[in-house]
């Protein structure tokens, strides 16, 4: 009973709020003249903000217009990469993708009123509208497989991100609302937006003045910050429709495939798409699977000031196990992974 109360209980204070005074039917429709539940619920809209043009736009026209093309609304990144893998078979694969892979598409309400179904669903606070989404109850619903557990230190044996544990920062400390609400630009993946977030926004002044840390002087911006400052993070493997995937902690350095980011080496995370991910629904659904790596650049949210890699040069130099090498690739992996492997491990440095 307690769970159901949390899911559906509407706080009396909500009824006198700006949204509450509009009345339930103004967003949820149904039949407000009926006294019987079955009649009252005819035509009921469970998530009105899924139709933001109708419900949210009259009062929030600019945000509603921008949100339609936002990555949170379109989850376009999945489609962008799957199109490349599917090639000529995309038209056949698209309806399967729409049915199976866009569950983390988010509506306005999934941040401001309720939890996303993938996070258990239910109202956040008695139907009160949260102007600033409570990140512990919303962001983690969709980003709970990797980002959220990393940030809060929920992977066994791995510490929380120092920005959370020491400074009590949250998602909004780095990520601007434009990343969530959109900018009216129909981005094909999330990278143009998250590329605007940089460690140098806060740490750049010291770095540019000339750090006393030798690694900063030697490597400059050739290395993504996380290469030296990340803890272990999870990679996912073998995702199949209807069966899910498995995951494991990992740490691999590889070559960056994004010139706009400005560094040569980045951390890589294994993503779960395999050649036969859609085999139960469509045979040979990904004929161009080899064109896209399944070791992808990543920015783990588990930053540590001190790690075993930044204690000495030889935390990385000569330490082959932390670099993605050819022998790390599985037999069925895409050939495009050869673009991100590190062919030559930096040699161990001798003490002077």
Over which residues does each language-model region extend?
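C-type cytochrome heme-c attachment and multiheme electron-transfer modules
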Residues: 1-119, 128-352
């Amino acid at each position: 009973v307690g769970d159901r109360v949390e899911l559906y209980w509407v706080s009396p204070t909500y009824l006198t709020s700006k949204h509450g005074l509009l009345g339930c039917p103004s967003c949820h429709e149904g039949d407000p003249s009926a006294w019987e539940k079955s009649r009252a619920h005819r035509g009921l809209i469970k998530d009105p903000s899924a139709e933001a043009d109708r419900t949210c736009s009259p009062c929030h026209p600019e945000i509603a217009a921008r949100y339609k093309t936002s990555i949170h609304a379109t989850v376009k990144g999945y489609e962008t990469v799957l199109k490349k893998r599917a090639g000529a078979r995309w038209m056949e694969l698209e309806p399967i993708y729409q049915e199976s892979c866009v569950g983390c598409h988010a509506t306005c309400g999934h941040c401001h009123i309720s939890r996303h179904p993938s996070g258990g669903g239910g109202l956040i606070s008695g139907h009160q509208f949260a102007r600033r989404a409570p990140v512990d109850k919303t962001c983690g619903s969709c980003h709970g497989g990797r980002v959220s557990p990393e940030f809060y230190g929920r992977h066994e044996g791995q510490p929380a991100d120092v920005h959370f544990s020491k400074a009590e920062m949250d998602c909004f400390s780095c990520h601007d609302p434009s990343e969530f609400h959109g900018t009216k630009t129909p981005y094909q993946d999330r990278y143009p937006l998250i590329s605007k977030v940089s460690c140098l926004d806060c740490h750049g002044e010291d770095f540019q003045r000339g750090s006393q840390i030798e690694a900063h002087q030697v490597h400059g911006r050739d290395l993504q910050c996380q290469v030296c400052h990340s803890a272990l993070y999870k990679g996912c493997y073998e995702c199949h429709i209807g069966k899910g995937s498995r995951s494991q902690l990992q740490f691999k350095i590889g070559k960056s495939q994004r010139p706009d980011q400005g560094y040569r080496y980045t951390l890589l995370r294994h993503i779960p798409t395999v050649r036969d991910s859609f085999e139960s629904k469509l045979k040979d659904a990904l004929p161009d699977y080899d064109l896209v790596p399944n070791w992808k650049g990543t920015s783990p949210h588990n930053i540590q000031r001190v790690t075993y890699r930044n204690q000495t040069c030889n935390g990385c130099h000569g330490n082959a196990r932390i670099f993605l090498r050819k022998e790390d690739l599985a037999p069925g992996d895409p050939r495009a992974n050869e673009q991100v492997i590190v062919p030559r491990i930096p040699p161990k440095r001798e003490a002077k």
